[in-house]
Amino acid sequence: MIINFLFKDHAAHIEIGGDFQEFLSDIMNLLPSFLDKDGYRQVTTFSHVSEKLMENIDKIVEKYKKRVIEVYKIRSLFKQYNQGEPFFIIPGAISKEELENLNSYLVTVNDPDPEESRKKLEELKSQISRSYRFIQQSGLVRVSIGEADKSKRVCRYCHKSTPEVTFKQIAHTISEALGNKTIITNTECDECNNRYGTGIEMDCANYHNFIRRFYNIRGKTPLKDGGTNFKIEHTTDGNIKIGITLTDAEISEFERDKKITGKLCFPLHVNQKFRPVNVYKALCKYVLGILDDDDMAPFQSTIDWMDGNLQISPLPKVAVLFPTNFHLNNPRISILIRTSEQEELPYSIGIVEFTDIAYCFIVPIQDDIVNYSDEELWNRIAKALPIYKPQIGWRLKDFSSDIQQDEIRSNLNFVQRSKQEDK
């Protein structure tokens, strides 16, 4: 028996062995109910997280803790969310289309006018489809992309097959270090998985070191508790403590900026080695990982560039949005492939989102018909791609440098909110 617990940023499909109809009944009784016209009690599948709900889940844990070990997973799942978070509980199998429709509902249900929000969401999808084919993996469910039979696999990157290469490892499409546990690329051989994992993907993980520490995202290797001048502690009650050591010069600058702007801004230093261009290459590798095997041919020059066998110059800038107005527990990967004859648009665009940072970037190919250095290029992209709107905070960043950086410097800004914002 499978019970689906659906949130807007996560879908958990928990399988319960044996015949546990009583357990299922108790789980469904967590949800609101009503009497139909014939007087029969009907249970809805939708509700919101609340104190009462958590109390009832604790009772279910106490009742079934010796019989249904999965009950602890259910409680841990709900503890991740704040009160008021919408969710569905649906028993049995659920299709990808149903999952997407329910997710659209969850994303918009708390909006002032959810119907209008869902309408706008569909309009955005329609606008994108006029220029691009849109492919996305949201990380809500575990997916394996590419040939399932290991004996028939051909690596999408090096084009080698067995017995020349092996496919024994689990190749995560986007690094575990960025929170991915669910999106897998079958057709990435062990040799390429290791090479990318210790190369461009390692640089990308290093570049996002502070975000990984702040959100306690653990990959294969343990995280340190801080940087050169700060330490981060995740307390047992769910809070985050940050201790920062400032030099005399930094203290003077902090006090001066505080008087002028009224904001609290602390410099953070992390000793991490990375090459900016490798961050860009890793982002491209992530989005290529969600394509079907048959869609890879146009991106051979991209792979050659990722592997250092081809120079693509100039490289376009990358659009970065941080923070976003949402938080993702699972990374979300999207790639758009041009279907129209609009020569003013790039052939392919990638979008990578995790925690509360988003990247929108051109997937570079050698024979693209657009000029990557054209200053108007991103303005044209904004018209075709409503996801990218400079006015909501996207900024363009240059990741073209192949010079190794030994330190990451960033700022931690605190903005005082009004009492009305806290209500």
Where are the regions a protein language model picked out?
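Short Cys/His-rich Zn2+-coordinating modules
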Residues: 131-144, 168-176
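Polybasic, low-complexity binding patches
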Residues: 196-238
